[in-house]
């Protein structure tokens, strides 16, 4: 393991089919043991063609509550809000920021859609980024594009490259 490696945890999907409260409690206990620098949180959203296509999606309130719980448990970790939360609510990622997430994952390229050129897809992505920026700025949040080291990582590695602001 590299001495400057950040400890991250892959996607934590919430409100999975058949999930029970004790599973969530076990997951949170495991997270405390791992004590990750980064937690990527994604809601469960059913998809056609899968065995769970008829299951209910994650409730937005549940997702936001879990985001807030993770922020209290891990005040110095990066908590990433997946763009998938926008399929539950159009402002899902922004609401996740208000609930404690501090990283927005934004796809670099929009998904391929028949009849949409890469240029018009890029314009759509630019509009989405501008909308995110405006929404966050209106609530005194600053959106930056940088390396994204967590506060825990920077405390352990004070000579790590400084973040750009």
Task: List each model region and its residues.
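Single conserved hydrophobic/aromatic residue that forms the stacking wall/gate
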Residues: 1-9, 13
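Extended alpha-helical regions
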Residues: 7, 25-32, 45
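Active-site-proximal beta-alpha loop/turn segments in soluble metabolic enzymes
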Residues: 10-19, 47-53
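Active-site glycine- and acidic-residue-rich loops that bind
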Residues: 14-28, 83-90
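Auxiliary Fe-S-binding modules of radical SAM enzymes
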Residues: 32-165
């Amino acid at each position: 393991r590299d001495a400057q490696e950040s400890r991250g945890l892959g996607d934590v999907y919430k409100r999975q089919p058949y999930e029970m409260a004790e599973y969530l409690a076990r997951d949170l206990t495991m997270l405390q043991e791992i004590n990750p620098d980064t937690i990527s949180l994604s809601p469960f959203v059913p998809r056609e063609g899968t065995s769970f296509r008829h299951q209910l999606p994650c409730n937005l309130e549940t997702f936001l509550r879990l985001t807030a719980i993770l922020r209290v448990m891990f005040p110095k970790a990066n908590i990433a809000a997946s763009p998938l939360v926008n399929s539950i609510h159009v402002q899902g990622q922004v609401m996740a920021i208000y609930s404690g997430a501090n990283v927005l994952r934004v796809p670099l390229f929009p998904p391929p859609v028949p009849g949409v050129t890469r240029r018009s897809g890029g314009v759509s992505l630019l509009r989405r980024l501008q909308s995110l920026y405006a929404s966050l700025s209106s609530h005194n949040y600053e959106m930056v594009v940088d390396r994204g080291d967590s506060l825990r990582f920077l405390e352990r590695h004070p000579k790590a490259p400084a973040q750009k602001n």
